[in-house]
Amino acid sequence: MLTSGLLLVAAVAFLSVLVLMSVWKQRKLSGKLPPGPTPLPFIGNFLQLNTEQMYNSLMKISQRYGPVFTIYLGPRRIVVLCGQEAVKEALVDQAEEFSGRGEQATFDWLFKGYGVVFSSGERAKQLRRFSIATLRDFGVGKRGIEERIQEEAGFLIDSFRKTNGAFIDPTFYLSRTVSNVISSIVFGDRFDYEDKEFLSLLRMMLGSFQFTATSMGQLYEMFSSVMKHLPGPQQQAFKELQGLEDFITKKVEHNQRTLDPNSPRDFIDSFLIRMLEEKKNPNTEFYMKNLVLTTLNLFFAGTETVSTTLRYGFLLLMKHPDIEAKVHEEIDRVIGRNRQPKYEDRMKMPYTEAVIHEIQRFADMIPMGLARRVTKDTKFRDFLLPKGTEVFPMLGSVLKDPKFFSNPKDFNPKHFLDDKGQFKKNDAFVPFSIGKRYCFGEGLARMELFLFLTNIMQNFHFKSTQAPQDIDVSPRLVGFATIPPTYTMSFLSR
């Protein structure tokens, strides 16, 4: 008994010393880091966080520690930036220092620092420069891609008409349509809406995207080193990501076999040609792994964010039929019913532009932003961030900054209208992030949102299964991504 008691005392003493050493070490490391709650060994600040409401948990901590604070997601040390001023200071005023890519554990299982989105340094710069130029070559920002979007909008409207006013879940109607625009650029062709492989790909994208917003997805962000070896829903997300990579690899292999270096058909061909041009360059970033994963980056990002934003937008417009009616009125007055909307019409449609911006602000697709990493020891305000420190630029806190939006929790297009009813820009409108690593698909996404929404609303009224006052527009999940509620609706011809 005495021996057991001594062993217990020794074990408790040993653990106490470990905790004290950990706290001392963290304080030493964090001597010039922003303040924050004291972490525990391995679990960090897990006990102070609600993984079902990670964004809200972090914002609650900011109320105590200020707009710049330090948090430990398990063993991961993160500096969190809240509000327009702090985020702009970092991502714009000190853009180079904050240009590294931080961890996104679920996607990092596959990407591991490759591809244009999840890479850093020279790799990220080269892939980004190439991707922007190639997208432009294939019509992004030009009349060519506008015609492609209008063509796809026509297919979508036909699909909605075939429902004959029945109540449907619009999720895959929208993702098929939006995905076909980016597919025509990266693969050189669109998919048939009933293509089983296409629908399987869309389910894989939706599934892995939604996992990042779940409680388990946020838990995986903290403890990925252990959880990646354990059973659980993360394994399904990995399976979906692997399925997407396998599909892209198959597409690339087909393009390799049929490549004409003098006549690129799509993004994949352009990358393959660049690989041939640089095959003798030992420092090239143009090789198969970056091709497959950059293509997957474009395919994934070009599908999920815009389609989910539209899905949230439909719900918001059913909640606010007065706003829907004003958009209908502006469409009828500026465009009429006899021609398709054009992107240039937005210049004469301030109310519709304001509504689209407010949908994006309210939907807040990536509330914690894509994690950044400082590329060197960085002085930020009164703090010193050691090289490699991860940073969360809380885009949601900018989109809801009360200094810039009078009623940030309310859906109100007046946030983007001046006293004369004209559209006004807002420095806190950052759904595509800001600085050197802003989303370079922003121009395409803006065009898609305007053309798809106006084409649909030119042809249909929206009808919910519920009265407007009973519609709940609170997000279903909020983690890495914001996921709107699941609902059904009817498209009634106008």
Curated annotation (Swiss-Prot):
Protein name: Cytochrome P450 2A5
Note in the entry: There are only 11 differences between the sequence of testosterone 15-alpha-hydroxylase and that of coumarin 7-hydroxylase. By site-directed mutagenesis it has been shown that modification of position 209 is sufficient to convert the specificity of the two forms of the enzyme.
Protein residues bound to heme: C439
PROSITE patterns: CYTOCHROME_P450
A GO cellular-component term linked to this record: endoplasmic reticulum membrane
GO annotation, biological process: cellular response to cadmium ion; heme metabolic process; response to stilbenoid
Origin species: Mus musculus
Pfam families linked: p450
